[in-house]
């Protein structure tokens, strides 16, 4: 049983890493000079890290069977890819679960991601990433 738990935690870690990477590189903010800045150039606050880990754990646990199906259904599709798609799909970017050729699995994951609601990173006054 401990081995299964270790595997599942490793899958969650991969999912979370993919989510954070996609959430940050796909997001921008406006600096004090009115210039657009890429979020991924900044360090994450504790709040951002906690928010991302909690959101990923909740989605991962609630949709684990479909995430497993997705990784088995499409060759080369990993938990990291699935985390990436969670970030893009929940924020309704132009790519995500729905365009992976995952059929019903993709539709269920898309609906679940949309139900999770959008979340947007921003840069705080301390130049750290926060999530609202």
Task: Tell where the protein language model's regions lie, with residue ranges.
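Long, highly charged low-complexity segments enriched in Glu/Asp and Lys/Arg with interspersed Ser/Thr
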Residues: 125-132
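Long, contiguous N-terminal structural blocks used for assembly/anchoring
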Residues: 1-70
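Intrinsically disordered, low-complexity, compositionally biased regions/tails
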Residues: 22, 38, 98-100, 131
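Amphipathic protein-protein interaction modules
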Residues: 54-125
């Amino acid at each position: 049983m401990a081995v299964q738990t270790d595997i599942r935690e490793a899958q969650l870690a991969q999912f979370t890493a993919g989510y954070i990477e996609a959430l940050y590189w796909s997001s921008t903010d406006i600096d004090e000079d009115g210039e657009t800045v890429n979020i991924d150039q900044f360090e994450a606050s504790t709040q951002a890290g906690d928010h991302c880990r909690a959101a990923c754990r909740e989605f991962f646990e609630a949709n684990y069977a479909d995430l497993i199906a997705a990784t088995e259904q499409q060759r080369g599709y990993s938990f990291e890819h699935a985390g990436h798609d969670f970030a893009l799909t929940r924020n309704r970017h132009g790519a995500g679960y729905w365009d992976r050729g995952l059929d019903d699995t993709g539709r269920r994951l898309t609906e679940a991601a949309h139900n999770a609601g959008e979340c947007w990173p921003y840069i705080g006054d301390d130049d750290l990433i926060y999530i609202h």
